[in-house]
Amino acid sequence: RETAQGVTESYEVERDVLLDMLFHEVKENVEVIFNDSISSLEQSAEEVTVTFTSGKRRSFSLLLGCDGTHSVVRKICFGEESSFSLFMQNYFGLSIVDKLLIAEDTGQMFNVPGKTVMLNAYNNKTDIAFCFFSEEEIAYDQRDLNQQMDMIRQHFEREGWRISELLEEMARCNNFYFDKLCQIRMDSWSKGRVALVGDAAYCPSPAAGMGGSMAILGAAALADALRKYPNDFKLAFQEYDRSFRPITEQIQANAIEFGMELVMPRTEEAIQRRNAQFGTVER
């Protein structure tokens, strides 16, 4: 809900906690396969047959790809990621440390033009996020964490504030994640008996702060559509697109128009403009 000052109040649930909650709800009724993924698929009029990386083959009525921004299901069924990825000219590195670097339940942000550091403290943990502007996409090894950390260091090591301390914390953590800031935009979220949900279909980027929420809302929209058309998956997929696409397009547009200026201003003027807006908000 919104407060009198227009600030939206919400509850934030840690990713691991949310996953445990969801798994607890479905574990008695859903077969869950760990440590395996799809390597290929074949569709017929009656079913989808998939081959797993383990070599096993299984057939299903429908295949729903909920496997994130770099979706394997999307690549196999729809084509290369580059056809659907909108690069937002920023890269980010995220680390989570098991201690408080600022007061609990608070956040801090450091900005210079084209560079942002954000701290978010909760439950005796602190998220450390580094983000930097890049006009072009950067070629790097997605498996080489040291190379990715070096890119963060090269962009931030000469900055002041607490940067040296935070870079050391980043180097010591065992959960570092690095990626480009991007959105996934597709003309269609389904092909035959395959449909995509969440970031795989309509990632809004971290600038939106809505990835998890959109995945849950999208799953609910798809479930509603399948319930509405239980005997016709084609109509169900069309209904899913019709009902949920306006929401995804609005959130993605807001991330571009407002989220980037809020979190990653590129000029000193943009930083001052953002700070002035913060100054008018009462907490």
Residue ranges and their predicted role:
Residues 258-282:
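C-terminal domain-closing interface element
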Residues 141-175, 241-242, 246:
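Flavin-binding catalytic cores
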Residues 99-105, 137-138, 162, 187, ...:
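Short helix-loop capping/hinge motifs at secondary-structure junctions, enriched
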Residues 71, 92-94, 114-118, 201-202:
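Histidine-centered metal-chelating micro-motifs
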Residues 64-65, 93, 151, 171-257, ...:
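Conserved mid-domain beta->alpha element of the FAD-binding
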Residues 40, 116-118, 186:
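Short, surface-exposed charged micro-motifs
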Residues 106-138, 149, 153-158:
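Active-site substrate-recognition segment that forms the wall
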Residues 1-94, 137-150, 182:
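Conserved N-terminal helical subregion
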